[in-house]
From Swiss-Prot:
Function: Metalloprotease which may be important for placentation by regulating biological activity of key peptides at the embryo-maternal interface. Involved in coat pigmentation patterns. During skin development, may be required to establish the periodicity of tabby markings, initiating a pre-pattern at or before hair follicle development.
Tagged with keyword Repeat: no
Binding site for Zn(2+): H416, H420, E439
Cofactors named for this entry: Zn(2+)
Transmembrane annotation, as ranges: 14-34
Cellular compartments per GO CC: cytoplasm; extracellular space; membrane
Family listed: Belongs to the peptidase M1 family.
Keyword Cell cycle: no
Active site: E417 (proton acceptor), Y505 (proton donor)
Glycosylation (residues): N133, N262, N289, N347, N361, N489, N584, N602, N609, N655, N811, N850, N889
Protein name per Swiss-Prot or TrEMBL: Aminopeptidase Q
Length: 992
């Protein structure tokens, strides 16, 4: 050590000794305090004592011969023994997202006792207790155990073993548990043992615990309040996927760690209990207060992951049927069952099971299937093995649902969840990074199931409408994510929840469809049969799937691929975005490039240099051609050249089965435009749809001129397919255009141009609405597209549309039992209010107050914002913040009002005078959302500054930079739209 510095603080030796003594005393005091406070982080062996926990659940079957050591639970949501981020601990496996591979769970004996009682559900929470015995196999010597636990108070913990291979006897030893603590960041419970577990031996972890059930949280265990037969009632249900099982019971909460489960539920006698398996038996017990509770036990499950564990406690009725010996029951509110609302779902569920059993040649392994309809369920539906959980709006038919897409929606979702019984339940992805293996294939087979039962079902067009259109609009290079991710990319549990998105479901389904298209359906299904059979009751990775496809491809000679299946498909699943395929029809030259939002001229600024191995199915002059492959960045295909003949044209991507967009040179687009104008029916509907959607998307992102897309619309007077019109209108009549008050130059031109072409399709569907609206019942594409057609016709001022709206609205207000046809109800309500007075507005308010279905209330909320009277809108906002009728999020009302032509100015003024009331209830984030809506039309930096100054006193400091950046993005978008609109206006002048 070098000499001391000339500056500093010096003390004598005596003073130094005194300071050292004081420091030691301080450290000792801190150590004592840490030990006392450490009960929140660790439980020492001296703290363990024997004895039962008052009012706690009895031991699971087979463990009642002795009590586990216990310690008092904490009565808070934060678990007893939680090591919070502020507590220091050495680095270790508890800092990793994945469990260490020391233990493999084999079997769970799980008992849960939620304290749900009739007429006692005023509190937002209720308590539950439970016990779980987990039989595990040790794979590596360890004196430390990790398993998942979140928001649970661990009341006792014991490790028994090693277990003998024969029947259980009393000679099983115990492994001392020296310490129990929680690593909150990664949601682990850690057991420090006094001895080492031996590889190859089996042990039993015995844990008792308690926690809280939250009302409407819909994670783990939750309870809901609803109305049935005129009475308020409560039910309890579960949602374990993806990582919420750990908040219900300590477990090894990873999908690969499958085990069998014996589940016991203790519940009030006035309720029934459901779980994955059939009921095995019932008995009774009394709690410390003498109250009687029912103990319901269930049969042993197959091997399954923790995320499929399910239970429900409710006072429901059911309807049932048997399909191939399997009992199928649908449970719902007693009113709903009595009214026959579950009949449609019940009638199609069995046949869907049978179809998939036959398709995969694998029987459904459970003896029963229960499907329960919850009054509200944010996850829409969940495929739990043996107990599927649905939001009732997606399972039950109402009497007024006849002219809606409800039957199709129920069919889609039931097919999806039943498909999971094979993809996900029988064969589970090894980890969440490959979640598309279950969600993508379940989404894909929705369409095969429905097409089987309804051969007239227009599978390609509906797939585009439901799946492809949405994901192609969101997926692009650099920003979006890949379908399959590397496990090491995940660092937090919250990232798993983010995987349930368009890329998992829609892109996953689209890639499965593309794979099927270039292999053919027989090869595709044969490979899936092999995959499902091999990995039944086990787990698989993406490479396992590719291996089975390769095996089937290698066993035949008809399908020849340019590369192994893995090499082809990994490009699509591991890379983000998708390619744009551009064909020069004069030379046959084809190239691929990544699709970007707002392509820039200097492509070197972008770093996405990936290519794909692209299957090109194509047609020439209406005739299907042989499959070719674009397996590098560019390639020449002489067979794709076209002559000067007006009858010579080429379309790539047959039936839109490839996951890419298609561009052509100017000659190629011109040929297609000419064919549309000469004989549009020569081009299949799916390709008229494709050309419109591709051309507008490519024009908005600088791949082609906007005039190229607009040229394709000239033929529309001859277009009688409403789904093609839908593609035109969603691309041409956008929300930005409708709400832009500066579009006065374009509007009259667009009105004249579109009405001239739209009148034919309008007359067709307006006649159906007036004379035989029931005819729409089985036309799914019309039910999907009609609202946009109706909305646009009225926005363009078509008098017949406005008159029909007035007729339907007046008929409904005079006789509310005469329902407005569902597909156009929102539009009719809006125009009824817009052209009405406060009398019509008050009528809707009264209807809102008497509606219980959230979907209907949302429609009415939107319609009431359509008023053009400032005083009515101001009163609406007052009601939203201060009056009783609006029990949902009042900021939604302000947002829908702000989006209206008159309302944006009313909301701005209202916020000046009422921000305190709004901010206290909803915080500044609601203000930020409103700011973006109000700022939708900004186009200068001065407008940004003015808007920020207006809101400056209401924003928190950390939000100001974010908001300015967002407003700058809006400004740039608006400037781009302004330039685009100017070019569209010029084109309309020439062609109107």
């Amino acid at each position: 050590m070098g000499p001391p510095s000339s500056s500093g603080f010096y003390v004598s030796r005596a003073v130094a000794l005194l300071l050292a003594a004081l420091a030691a005393a301080l450290l000792l005091a801190l150590a004592v305090l840490a030990a006392l406070y450490g009960r929140c982080a660790r439980v020492q062996p001296s703290d363990l004592h024997h004895g039962g926990v008052p009012d706690a659940a009895s031991s699971p079957r087979g463990t009642q011969e002795e009590q586990l050591p216990t310690w008092p639970p904490r009565p808070t949501r934060e678990p007893a023994g939680t090591a919070t981020p502020g507590h220091w601990r050495p680095p270790g496996p508890w800092d990793q997202l994945r469990l260490p591979p020391w233990l493999v769970p084999l079997h769970y004996e799980l008992e849960l006792w939620p304290r749900l009682r009739p007429n006692e559900f005023q509190s937002p929470t209720l308590s539950f207790t439970g016990r779980v015995n987990i039989t595990v196999r040790c794979t590596a010597a360890t004196a430390r155990l990790l398993l998942h636990s979140l928001f649970l108070d661990c009341e006792s913990a014991e490790v028994r073993g090693p277990l003998s291979s024969g029947p259980r006897d009393g000679a099983v030893g115990r492994v001392p548990v020296d310490d129990v603590w929680f690593a909150f960041d990664m949601q682990y419970m850690v057991l420090e043992l006094g001895a080492t577990l031996q590889p190859g031996s089996r042990y039993e972890l015995q844990l008792s615990f308690s926690g809280l059930v939250y009302r409407d949280l819909r994670e783990g265990l939750f309870f809901s309040i609803y109305t049935d037969q005129g009475e308020r009632r409560a039910l309890l249900a579960s949602q374990m996927e993806p990582t919420f099982a750990r908040s219900v019971f300590p477990c090894f909460d990873e999908p690969a760690l499958k085990a069998t489960f014996n589940i016991t539920i203790i519940h009030h006698p006035s309720y029934g209990a459901l779980s994955n398996m059939p009921k095995l038996g019932q008995s009774e017990k009394r709690d410390v207060n003498g109250s009687v509770w029912t103990i319901t036990t269930f049969s042993t499950t197959p091997h399954m992951p923790t995320y499929l564990v399910a239970l429900a406690i409710c006072d429901y009725d059911h309807v049932s049927r048997t399909e191939r010996g399997q009992e199928i029951r649908i449970w719902a509110r007693k009113d709903a069952i009595a009214n026959g609302n579950a009949a449609f779902a019940l009638n199609i569920t069995g046949p869907i099971f049978s179809f998939l059993e036959d398709l995969f040649n694998i029987s459904y392994p459970l003896p029963k299937t229960d499907i329960i309809a919850l009054p509200t369920f944010d996850n829409s539906a969940m495929e739990n093995w043996g107990l599927l959980i649905f939001d009732e709006s997606l399972l039950l038919m109402q009497p007024n649902d006849q002219v809606t897409d409800k039957k199709a929606v129920i069919s889609f979702i039931l097919s999806h969840e039943i498909g999971h019984q094979w993809f996900g339940n029988l064969v589970t992805m090894n980890w969440w990074n490959d979640i598309w293996l279950k969600e993508g294939f379940a989404s894909y087979f929705e369409f095969g199931v429905i097409n089987y039962f309804n051969p007239k079902f227009r599978r390609n067009e509906v797939f585009f409408s439901n799946i492809l259109h949405h994901v192609l609009s969101e997926d692009h290079a650099l920003v979006s994510r890949a379908v399959s991710l590397k496990v090491e990319n995940f660092t937090e549990t919250s990232e798993i929840n983010e995987l349930f998105d368009l890329f998992t479901y829609n892109k996953g389904a689209s890639l499965a469809r593309m794979l099927s298209s270039f292999l053919n359906e027989n090869v595709f299904i044969s490979a899936l049969k092999s995959y499902l059979k091999t990995f039944s009751y086990s787990t698989a990775e993406q490479d396992d799937l590719w291996r089975h496809f390769q095996m089937v491809v290698d066993d035949q000679s008809k399908i020849l691929l340019p590369a192994p299946v893995k090499s082809i498909m990994d490009r699509w699943t591991h890379q983000s975005g998708f390619p744009v395929i551009t064909l020069n029809v004069s030379t046959g030259a084809m190239k691929q490039e990544p699709f970007y939002l707002g392509k820039v001229k200097n492509q070197t600024l972008l770093t996405h240099n990936d290519t794909w191995i692209v299957p090109i199915l194509w047609i020439k002059n209406g005739i299907t051609q042989s499959l070719v492959w674009l397996d590098k960045s560019s390639k020449i295909f002489p067979e794709m050249q076209v002559s000067d003949s007006d009858h010579d044209w080429v379309i790539l991507n047959l039936n839109m089965t490839g996951y890419y967009r298609v561009n052509y040179d100017k000659v190629g687009w011109k040929k297609l435009k000419q064919q549309l104008e000469k004989d549009p029916k020569a081009i299949p509907v799916i390709h008229r749809l494709q050309m419109i959607d591709d051309a507008f998307s490519l024009s908005k992102n600088n791949y082609v001129e906007i005039e190229t897309a607009l040229d394709l619309t000239k033929y529309l007077a001859e277009e009688d397919e409403i789904i093609v019109w839908y593609a035109v209108l969603v691309n041409l009549v956008t929300k930005d255009l409708v709400f832009d008050v500066n579009n006065y130059d374009m509007y009259p031109l667009l009105k004249k141009y579109l009405l001239k072409r739209l009148i034919s399709i309008w007359n067709m569907y307006s006649t159906v609405i007036r004379e035989n609206v029931a005819a729409l019942q089985d036309d799914y594409l019309a039910l999907v597209a009609l609202e946009k057609l109706f909305e646009t016709a009225c926005w363009l001022g078509l008098e017949d549309c406005l008159q029909l709206s007035r007729e339907l609205f007046k008929n409904w207000t005079n006789h509310p039992e005469n329902e407005i046809p569902y597909p156009i109800k929102s539009v009719v309500l809006c125009y009824g209010v817009a052209f009405g007075s406060d009398e019509e507005w008050d009528f809707l308010l009264n209807m809102y107050s008497n509606k219980t279905k959230e979907e209907e209330r949302i429609q009415l909320t939107y319609a009431m914002s359509c008023s053009k009277d400032p005083w009515i809108l101001h009163r609406y906002l007052e009601y939203a913040v201060t009056a009783a009728p609006f029990t949902f999020n009042e900021t939604n009302i302000m947002e829908v009002v702000a989006e209206s032509e008159v309302g944006r100015y009313i909301v701005k003024d209202f916020l000046i005078n009422n921000w305190q009331a709004v901010s206290e209830r909803y915080g500044t984030q609601s203000l930020v959302n409103l700011m973006y809506i109000i700022g939708r039309t900004i186009s200068t930096d001065l407008q940004i500054t003015e808007l920020q100054q207006f809101f400056s006193n209401m924003l928190e400091e950390h939000q100001k930079l974010t908001v300015r950046a967002k407003l700058q993005t809006i400004k740039n978008k608006n400037l781009g739209n302004k330039k685009l609109n100017a070019r569209m206006t010029a084109w309309l002048r020439k062609n109107t």
